[in-house]
Amino acid sequence: MKDNERRILLGRIVGAFGVRGEIKLESWTEPRSAIFRYQPWILRSPNGQESTLEGARGRDSGKHLVARFPGIEDRDTVEAMHGTEVYVARSALPPPNADEYYWVDLEGLDVKTTEGVALGQVSHLFSTGANDVVVVRGDRERMIPFVLPEFVKSVDFEANLVVVDWDPEF
């Protein structure tokens, strides 16, 4: 699958809201309401069935987003969708700003130190609140703060490489 055709997981249906077909939606976008900007959605049910949806809209409601999907008007339909994952094609996301990256684009890149020591590949990233952390898996797992330019010196997609200023023994 080409990179721009890859599916990016943005959220999940976590329940019904009220009795008129509104949906409680968990979003992993930043900000979380940005999920509504990226459409069409590819919905994947827990049993693997997929459908495409365009026209989802919603609002913030504290812990979750509350969404409305075209054609869904009752709670029973929503409850049957519990656990459904919301994806978009990578091409639906706008290009990131300079020195900003989508985590999914970093996954799988090789990681080397500024001295050329191979540490492994980017497995995934997570946020600590203070900064993001890149998890590198190689001969062992390392967690490196994704802080530009202090620890992460460069990201080169053409070379499939992230260069870090990091002690390979740490």
Swiss-Prot record:
Cellular localization per UniProt: Cytoplasm
Purpose of the protein: An accessory protein needed during the final step in the assembly of 30S ribosomal subunit, possibly for assembly of the head region. Essential for efficient processing of 16S rRNA. May be needed both before and after RbfA during the maturation of 16S rRNA. It has affinity for free ribosomal 30S subunits but not for 70S ribosomes.
Family: Belongs to the RimM family.
Stretches assigned to the PRC barrel domain: 97-170
Record-level Gene Ontology MF annotations: ribosome binding
GO biological process: ribosomal small subunit biogenesis; rRNA processing
Recorded coiled-coil stretches: none
GO cellular component terms listed in the entry, alphabetical order: cytoplasm; ribosome
Keyword Cytoplasm: yes
Domain remarks in the Swiss-Prot or TrEMBL record: The PRC barrel domain binds ribosomal protein uS19.
Protein name listed in UniProt: Ribosome maturation factor RimM
